[in-house]
Amino acid sequence: MTTLSLDLHSSGQTVTVAPGDRLELRLEENPTTGFRWYIENDKNDVLILEHDAFTHVHDGVSGSGGTRDLVFKVAKQGQITLRASYRRSWETQKPPHGTFELTVTAK
């Protein structure tokens, strides 16, 4: 069982993993502005979202940013393109402020 650590620079890449492995995705975020990362296709049978949390860079500093920490377990063989968007939840008609896309092949 392996844990693969990824960040925004991994967007556009393809990774190969095995069932039982984990993907750890850390994306910079500042929810005080209303923006946060949303997984667009979290309903799939290849990756299971096990952890979704925000970590402040500077604890106790109002308005500071941090990272959205996401951990996925590879549940079975297959292929999925994991997509995330950086947007405000109430701005559904606007394009996202940022995107992340990763093709995951599990074999």
Model-derived regions: residue spans:
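Aromatic sugar-binding surface patches on proteins
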Residues: 63-69
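Interdomain boundary/hinge segments at the C-termini of tandem beta-sandwich modules
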Residues: 104-106
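N-terminal edge beta-strand
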Residues: 1-24, 30
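A charge-rich, low-complexity, intrinsically flexible signal that marks solvent-exposed coils, linkers
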Residues: 12, 35-38
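Glycine-centered tight-turn and secondary-structure capping sites
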Residues: 75-82
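Short acidic/polar inter-strand loop motif in beta-rich domains
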Residues: 87-94
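Ligand-binding face of N-terminal immunoglobulin V-set domains in extracellular IgSF glycoproteins
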Residues: 70-71, 83
